[in-house]
Amino acid sequence: MAKISLIQREFKRQRLVLKYEKKRTFLKREIQRTPFLKQKLQFHRILQQLPRNSASVRLHNRCLVTGRSRGYYRDFGLSRHVLREMAHQGFLPGVIKSSW
């Protein structure tokens, strides 16, 4: 189980990304569209004043159950350990143990 503080920090980042998503995409689009250097610099300055954690690049995928960041399966939102246990218990419909 990951530390509670790490899980909460990641949750805070997710909220910030959602809060500033429209503003950030608008500013990036305007930087690309504007042919004038002064306006580009002005938009860039506004973009830099946004919180760092509002950038989607700073998000990490974490397991919904344990908060583990490594061995994460995007399709399920779970780490490999939890995925294996839940599959064995039958909590994931359609997931079967492979054999050939």
From Swiss-Prot:
Signal peptide: none annotated. One of its GO terms (molecular function) is rRNA binding. Keywords: Chloroplast, Plastid, Ribonucleoprotein, Ribosomal protein, RNA-binding, rRNA-binding. Pfam families: Ribosomal_S14. One of its GO terms (biological process) is translation. One of its GO terms (cellular component) is small ribosomal subunit. Part of the 30S ribosomal subunit. Belongs to the universal ribosomal protein uS14 family. This is Small ribosomal subunit protein uS14c. The lineage of its organism: Eukaryota, Viridiplantae, Chlorophyta, core chlorophytes, Chlorophyceae. The gene is rps14.
